[in-house]
């Protein structure tokens, strides 16, 4: 083998990289175990322990525990539990604001029509709007709509329609970016470990958010869907406010000493970072960690009695700026509780508002201290004197000293009020507040007129960029609405972990046994070693990408292992052929690797093509599956073709392993000299296939498919009851209350206690409270089959599994459903086209392409037909959803592997025996590759059966589709693709001979 040195170096470097990234997972698990041991079952204390070490350097003196947790392999929502949502910024609302909410009839009608068409069209709202407006108002320029004050520097009366459309796209993109920045900030404050938020570039206005471990979905819904609220406030100085805080501390001493504390008010006097919780365990925890003695702990308790507020709030009595105090983030909630008491509020000025800074104090190396700002409310209505809707633009730049700064422009009204505000506060600070948190409080040097300002300070470039984003978010014209949602409870996630691990282990063991049984112990173990390396490298690469491992991802990894065996099977089968030809082991093995390379390369590349299409058209779990599948295939190519070759070359260079036969007693002569007449009955095979396709089409046309909410829109609720229930009983209960809405109920699992309820009830309605109202309505409807002590709070608690509760839920809005349906069709069509083109390029004969695409189309129709025939009869769900489309594409990728290997042998035989009859040549090609075809199919079926039986309900339908794909894909390679290619070549040759005879 050439380039052995490069392969060795690459393998060593890849191993080191994978060890490095995987090591973070071991570090975090070590400290998680210590936290569990310390907490002794108290979840809160366990979390406090981990939080106390979050900014401590725990790994090689360079990485904090927080950084290690960010670098570890994260678990997806279906394994860890949590919430996945897709939010959509209303593009029509943005356009309305940009047009200054014009009442023009043509404008409003065009916009309404565009919004309606966007749910089914592949064109975006802007394209549809422009088209409709030109229909309704022929010759009317767009500039007359958008030459507004807000767009005065971008659109004039002389702007062309193309220029206006470009500006609209830029403004909509900016609005989505603003929403993205607001959501990112809100999520960071929520304290979620390893959140994932990304703007879906191919879908205008949509943002995907994944929040592992979330236990309060209703709170998250409100957090994500709220409008951004940017405000500019006047401020107090710390020196002015300190006396009031001293009075509050004195008042609290009496309250805390009292046996009946004053009733706590529900106030927003100071909003804490959401990660903070009212707890007094932080101090005792710190003492335990630092080894403080009981006397010190007792002294601290006495101080907290005498100075309840100042024991946890460090004041800044002589400060000239608006920062009045500092506190550890663990204490902020308790401080809020104190400051919100009516008795304490009575000690404060009526115009004083205390708000926390959004970021930790910059001089705290542990990043655990937050600043408390004193805001002055000077308006009679209690609102801010200036709000973010007046900000026209903001950008980060550098001042004339070369330091990071932020420039900001306001509209005419904002410029006038800004001039007045800055004039009244020269020498003082103005706080920039978003969603109740202070982002910056720059000092006013002089009156600012004209509406253009520059904010300077000790900014880093990143901080300047963040502040510019905050200022831009103030003009967010429309809030984001949830159009798709998945919520998975933690125990359901644990069940998925157990099922995934079990299916993976069993599949790996059976594959290892199979390889040793078919090719002998040493060759089998070499192939098995490649599988283990494949697993190690795949996990390492996933960890380096900070990709989340999902159940679909595990399925992709397991399937990649099954497909990885294909390369070893090809190499070993070719080696056996060379041995039968009388070659020595060294020469036979070298030729086996060389002759198998093109087939391995082509089959892997076609699978990667389908994986890329799957990644581009899928979201969430489907992308996770595609990611692990692509990585697994790439790694399997490296390990099977190069790593195993290094092993054999090393030992054979020392004249060892020269007695290998690459077979066992079972497989020694298995299909070695078969001579099936495949081509002799090609018309029979094609007739049978055609009949099967017609039957499947008939079922699809009459019975149809069971479409999931991915394609119809709606909500799924997976509900677990205390006792066994009948799905029909649940369906009747819900149908009686949900009116004309579609309702379906199916059993999940075998214990009869879990059902999945699907309905499109009120799915087209929008609003922050719709989801909560439907959950409450579902609770009232199911009360007769719930235990008597179950409350609404218990019923919607994903962690509760006693008495009956929702353990997971899913929502897909109508616009998302239409997009998924269109994307699914395009993904399958593009996969067939891409594979057809690739086969044409590689094999230089259209007969191969037509044969392959025709066979793949038959595979797809027959799988769809099987689902149409079987749904309602099988003891598991056969709904058509995104996962099913993933299975179809994966089956296409797998099926083409067989066809590529067979056509590769046909091409090889054409070169070796150019005068041999095509009929015999095709038969010989099919017979010589039959062992490989059957071995690969069996090894892949072993994996799929493990997933199907042990992988859990969530992945069973996927495995079933893949099993059908492997079976029909194997048959179509032998009885559809090859006969069609043969007949096309035969007809072409006959045509050429006819032309020659003329």
Please report, for each region that a protein language model flagged, where it lies by residue.
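Interfacial helix-loop-helix hairpins and adjacent transmembrane helices
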Residues: 1-17, 21, 25-69, 73, ...
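Non-transmembrane, solvent-exposed regions of membrane trafficking/translocation machinery
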Residues: 23-31, 51-56, 60, 68-435, ...
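Pore- and gate-forming transmembrane helices of large, multi-pass membrane proteins
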Residues: 183, 491-511, 563, 567, ...
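Hydrophobic alpha-helical transmembrane segments of membrane transport and translocation systems
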Residues: 8, 12, 533, 538-541, ...
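Juxtamembrane "pre-transmembrane" interface segments
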Residues: 210, 451-454, 462-509, 777, ...
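Juxtamembrane segments of multi-pass membrane proteins
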Residues: 698-746
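Hydrophobic transmembrane alpha-helices and their membrane-interface caps
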Residues: 517, 521-571, 849-908, 975
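Cytosolic juxtamembrane regions of multi-pass inner-membrane proteins
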Residues: 562-606, 647-657, 868, 874-936, ...
């Amino acid at each position: 083998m050439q380039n052995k040195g490069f392969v060795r170096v690459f393998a060593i470097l890849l191993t080191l990289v994978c060890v490095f990234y995987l090591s973070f997972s071991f570090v975090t698990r070590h400290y998680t175990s210590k936290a569990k041991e310390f907490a002794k079952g108290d979840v809160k204390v366990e979390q406090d322990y981990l939080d106390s070490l979050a900014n401590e350097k725990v790994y090689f003196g360079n990485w904090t525990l927080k950084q290690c947790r960010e670098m570890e392999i994260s678990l997806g929502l279906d394994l860890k539990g949590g919430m996945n949502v897709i939010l959509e910024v209303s593009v029509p609302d943005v356009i309305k604001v940009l047009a200054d909410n014009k009442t023009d009839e043509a404008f409003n009608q065009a916009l309404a029509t565009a919004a309606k068409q966007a749910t089914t069209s592949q064109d975006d709202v802007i394209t549809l709007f422009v088209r409709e407006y030109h229909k309704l108002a022929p010759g009317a320029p767009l500039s007359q709509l958008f030459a507004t004050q807000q767009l005065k520097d971008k659109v004039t009366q002389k702007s062309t329609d193309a220029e206006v459309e470009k500006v609209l796209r830029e403004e909509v993109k900016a609005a989505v970016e603003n929403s993205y920045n607001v959501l990112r900030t809100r999520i960071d404050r929520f304290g979620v470990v390893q959140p994932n938020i990304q703007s879906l570039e191919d879908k205008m206005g949509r943002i995907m958010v994944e929040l592992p471990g979330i236990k309060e979905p209703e709170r998250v819904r409100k957090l994500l869907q709220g409008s951004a609220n940017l405000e500019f406030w006047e401020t107090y100085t710390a020196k002015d406010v300190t006396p009031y805080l001293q009075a509050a501390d004195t008042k609290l001493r009496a309250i805390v000493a009292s046996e009946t504390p004053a009733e706590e008010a529900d106030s927003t006097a100071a909003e804490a970072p959401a990660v903070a919780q009212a707890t007094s365990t932080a101090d005792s925890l710190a003492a335990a960690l630092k080894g403080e003695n009981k006397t010190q702990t007792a002294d601290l308790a006495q101080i907290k009695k005498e100075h309840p507020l100042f024991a946890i709030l460090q004041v800044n009595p002589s400060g000239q700026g608006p920062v009045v105090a500092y506190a550890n983030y663990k204490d902020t909630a308790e401080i809020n509780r104190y400051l919100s008491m009516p008795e304490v509020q009575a000690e404060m000025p009526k115009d004083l508002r205390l708000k926390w800074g959004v970021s930790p104090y910059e001089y705290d190396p542990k990043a655990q201290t937050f600043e408390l700002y004193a805001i002055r409310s000077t308006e009679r209505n209690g609102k801010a004197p200036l709000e973010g809707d007046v900000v026209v633009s903001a950008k980060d730049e550098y001042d004339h000293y070369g330091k990071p700064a932020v420039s900001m422009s306001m509209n005419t009204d904002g410029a006038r009020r800004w001039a007045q505000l800055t004039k009244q506060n020269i020498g003082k600070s103005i706080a920039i507040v978003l969603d109740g948190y202070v982002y910056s409080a720059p000092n006013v040097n002089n009156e600012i007129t004209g509406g253009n300002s520059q904010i300077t300070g000790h900014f880093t470039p990143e901080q300047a960029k963040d502040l510019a984003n905050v200022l831009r978010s103030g003009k967010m014209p429309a809030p984001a609405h949830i159009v798709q949602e998945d919520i998975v409870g933690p125990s359901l996630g644990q069940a998925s972990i157990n099922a995934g691990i079990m299916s993976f282990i069993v599949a790996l063991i059976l594959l290892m046994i199979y390889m040793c049984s078919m090719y002998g112990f040493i060759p089998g173990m070499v192939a098995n070693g490649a599988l283990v390396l494949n697993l190690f490298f795949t996990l390492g690469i996933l960890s380096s990408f900070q990709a989340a491992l999902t159940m679909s991802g595990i399925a992709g990894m397991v399937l990649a292992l099954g497909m990885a065996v294909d390369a070893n099977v090809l190499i070993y089968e070719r080696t056996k052929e060379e041995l039968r030809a009388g070659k020595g082991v060294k020469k036979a093995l070298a030729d086996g690797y060389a002759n198998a390379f093109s087939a391995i390369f082509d089959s892997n590349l076609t699978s990667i093509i389908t994986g890329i299409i799957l990644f581009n058209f899928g979201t969430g779990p489907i992308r996770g599956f595609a990611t692990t599948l692509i990585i697994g295939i790439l790694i399997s190519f490296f390990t099977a073709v190069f790593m195993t070759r290094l092993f054999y070359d090393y030992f054979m260079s020392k004249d060892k392993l020269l007695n290998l036969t690459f077979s066992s007693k079972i497989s020694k002569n298995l299909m070695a000299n078969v001579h099936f007449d495949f081509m002799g009955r090609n018309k029979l095979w094609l007739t049978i296939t055609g009949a099967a396709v017609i039957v499947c089409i008939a079922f699809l046309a009459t019975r149809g498919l069971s479409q999931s909410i991915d394609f119809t829109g709606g909500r799924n609720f997976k509900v677990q009851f205390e006792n066994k229930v009948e799905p029909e009983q649940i369906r009747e209960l819900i149908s009686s209350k949900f009116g004309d809405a579609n309702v379906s109920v199916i059993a999940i699992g075998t214990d009869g206690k879990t059902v999945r309820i699907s309905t499109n009830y009120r799915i087209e309605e929008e609003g922050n409270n719709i989801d909560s109202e439907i959950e409450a309505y579902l609770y009232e409807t199911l009360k007769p089959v719930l235990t008597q002590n179950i409350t609404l709070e218990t019923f919607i608690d994903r962690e509760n599994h006693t008495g009956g509760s929702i353990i997971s839920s899913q929502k897909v809005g109508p616009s998302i459903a239409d997009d998924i349906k269109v994307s699914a069709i395009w993904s399958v069509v593009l996969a067939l086209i891409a594979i057809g083109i690739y086969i044409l390029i590689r094999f230089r004969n259209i007969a191969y392409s037509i044969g392959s695409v025709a066979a793949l189309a038959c595979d797809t129709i027959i799988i769809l037909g099987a689902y149409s025939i079987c749904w309602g009869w099988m003891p598991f769900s056969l709904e058509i959803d995104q996962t099913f489309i993933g299975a179809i594409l994966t089956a296409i990728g797998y099926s083409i592997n067989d066809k590529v290997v067979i056509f590769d042998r046909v091409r090889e035989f054409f070169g070796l025996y150019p005068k041999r009859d095509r009929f015999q040549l095709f038969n010989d090609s099919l017979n010589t590759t039959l062992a490989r075809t059957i071995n690969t199919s069996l090894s892949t079926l072993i994996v799929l059966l493990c997933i199907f039986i042990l992988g859990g309900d969530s992945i069973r339908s996927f495995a079933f589709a893949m099993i059908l794909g492997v079976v029909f894909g194997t048959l179509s390679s032998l009885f559809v693709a090859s006969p069609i290619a043969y007949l096309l070549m035969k007809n072409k040759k006959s045509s050429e001979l006819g032309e020659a005879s003329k």
